């Protein structure tokens, strides 16, 4: 049994009872990475020398009884769009292939303060644009459950690393489902917090009004510990909410008697595979058995979410990615004759096809003559989608449905059809547009591939999301299943 199969509090106990050391945990991470990452390809860069040195420091602190907090000594992986001081951060893009940040993102700083150990940086779709991690400029991450299948995206490396037992925790980012979808495909737990709950300072921006950093773990309890550690107001992020962070662990009571669940008919409609629907209905039976009730509801504007998202996210991306021009940092083309040519060549050679596609789509949507017809209208529809959620939450505690319409698909199956690829996020995108929190927890299998249950909560009510997710998890054994690598 791996140390990473244990819950965080059990690892914490073993550390303090001197049954294991921090160096043992770090050794376990790098040993497992050496064993399986040649197949899975989750990590882009390793922090081995510094991590081992830091582990020795923490072991000395443990001997002096100076260990603080439950994350003390725990190995963690970080998605490669979250900046890490002096540890290469590329966003899986050639244009940032040589970028070494000079500061830590706020979430990385918080984990350092909690004395967690950064093991390395994780692969992703380039600039978080994708649903399969096939858009990385460097490598294609595989699904640990079946190496011929994708792990999801854009946080595919983050989910695959946890599923493969390389690290117990990772950080991902979620703009339209990029934590929840790979968590579902890889059979792990992934939470997108409420927009503003976690600081975005140091997250390389894709779509600033949608991006949110969140935790990926093997179980709900550990997920709550990690969110507790990274949440809170940050003066460096103007969109960070100045609200107290509740004690998420106190929500994990297992008691959901009287809880009212809404199930949107749109989330079990056309395009959702029959096995996926059945897994959700089976999960609802489990929750009914625990004392909750559910009713079918409608989120009528969900059908417009995909188009709305791709207009808004691409528009924001076209502005955010303008900063990558070859002047200040990252890749610079050698084939230019003048400054303007250098801008063009750098971006043409540095960005991948999907990133270029979205920049062009966003630039078009923002252009004179099209702004009102596309961007402005999309913002209006976003408001309607948010109001749909608010209306349902007036009567219900949580919304439940599948995380994805299908299980993971084969590598290469959808790369030639961007619209089919985009449709993988049809059930997760509305949550980002509304800014509410949502989690994916394992709820079944289809031909050996994991399925995810999505639990959506009210603004800043991650506690209720965790309460339901934990109750379901404790009543089932899906979270205990491991891929054989």
Curated annotation (Swiss-Prot):
Enzyme class: ligase
Active site per UniProt: 79, 154, 178
GO cellular component, one term: glutamyl-tRNA(Gln) amidotransferase complex
EC number in record: 6.3.5.7
Pfam family, one: Amidase
Keywords: ATP-binding, Ligase, Nucleotide-binding, Protein biosynthesis
KW Zinc (keyword) present: no
GO biological process, one term: translation
Catalytic activity reported: L-glutamyl-tRNA(Gln) + L-glutamine + ATP + H2O = L-glutaminyl-tRNA(Gln) + L-glutamate + ADP + phosphate + H(+)
MF terms in GO: ATP binding; glutaminyl-tRNA synthase (glutamine-hydrolyzing) activity
InterPro entries: Amidase (IPR000120), Amidase_CS (IPR020556), Amidase_dom (IPR023631), AS_sf (IPR036928), GatA (IPR004412)
SUPFAM superfamilies the record matches: Amidase signature (AS) enzymes
UniProt record similarity statement: Belongs to the amidase family. GatA subfamily.
Function: Allows the formation of correctly charged Gln-tRNA(Gln) through the transamidation of misacylated Glu-tRNA(Gln) in organisms which lack glutaminyl-tRNA synthetase. The reaction takes place in the presence of glutamine and ATP through an activated gamma-phospho-Glu-tRNA(Gln).
Assembly information from the UniProt record: Heterotrimer of A, B and C subunits.
PANTHER family: GLUTAMYL-TRNA(GLN) AMIDOTRANSFERASE SUBUNIT A, TRANSAMIDASE
Protein name: Glutamyl-tRNA(Gln) amidotransferase subunit A
Species this chain originates from: Halalkalibacterium halodurans (strain ATCC BAA-125 / DSM 18197 / FERM 7344 / JCM 9153 / C-125) (Bacillus halodurans)
Gene: gatA
